[in-house]
Swiss-Prot record:
Belongs to the bacterial solute-binding protein 9 family. InterPro entries: Bact_metal-bind_prot9, ZnuA, ZnuA-like. It comes from Haemophilus ducreyi (strain 35000HP / ATCC 700724). PANTHER family: HIGH-AFFINITY ZINC UPTAKE SYSTEM PROTEIN ZNUA, HIGH-AFFINITY ZINC UPTAKE SYSTEM PROTEIN ZNUA-RELATED. Disulfide bonds join C253-C307. GO terms for biological process: zinc ion transport. The keyword Iron does not apply. Keywords: Disulfide bond, Ion transport, Metal-binding, Periplasm, Signal, Transport, Zinc, Zinc transport. Its main location: periplasm. GO terms for molecular function: metal ion binding. GO terms for cellular component: periplasmic space. The gene is znuA. This is High-affinity zinc uptake system protein ZnuA. Zn(2+) binds at H54, H144, H208, D280. Part of the ATP-binding cassette (ABC) transport system ZnuABC involved in zinc import. Binds zinc with high affinity and specificity and delivers it to the membrane permease for translocation into the cytoplasm.
Amino acid sequence: MFKKTVLTLAMLGVTTVANADVLTSIKPLGFIANAITDGVTETKVLLPVTASPHDYSLKPSDIEKLKSAQLVVWVGDGLEAFLEKSIDKLPKEKVLRLEDVPGIKMIVDATKKKDHDHHDHDHDHDHDHDHEHIHGHHHDKDWHIWFSPEASQLAAEQIAERLTAQLPEKKAKIAENLAAFKANLADKSNEITQQLQAVKDKGYYTFHDAYGYFERAYGLNSLGSFTINPTIAPGAKTLNAIKENIAAHKAQCLFAEPQFTPKVIDSLSKSTAVKVGQLDPLGAKVKLSKTAYPQFLQAIADEFSQCLTQ
């Protein structure tokens, strides 16, 4: 009887720790959180990597995940507006909204001002029936903060602080994890800076205005972004406009994303005569681990480097 009681209590203890999980809205935030939760508790990700945080619709199972998580980490309604109503119903102490972190807000606000001051007003618009258009960097706040090593470190600090409050018995391990995250990030940032030095003057266009923090952190030469339908081959008018911009600015590469169909990429490649690379903003191929975030940054750096060095 005594042995059974001890076993039951042990099982209950395991269940309690397992339930103290961190749920992040998107995978890149999971990369950051996993570094802090390693050996402490579990990190889970809400959105599938095939989904976009800009237009996702919550399922009933997603609502249950939000309710059962001990800590929910999201950027905020500036990026994931679909989450706002559901998160508003959760206790405030179990929600970490990164938009509200003062240091992160400062980074975002400073970037918005810098983009506004240096915005190129000489850009083209293409108003065909597909609503495809070409633009420089927009004036809205950029909440793709996981591309900022500085903002990501601040996010890690906040996750560590919240987790320590919930699991004080794990304080030492959480602090150890945070220190390791910072050291790994600093080392990786230095490596990427060296790696991209050779391509920092080569211009390129993307199809998603999401990479600004990474571009500024590592000195890349973005010429702007094109907005097109990723599943329908662009029309002649759009292709001509893209070609004109590429020629005018001597762009070396166009960067598509995983949701672009082969037909669209093939059309762009044949019509523009430049290399078409691919960037993965949500790190679909990177597995959650304690070193996942530096691996994610390295994957993005490699994607830039591979296209721009050819």
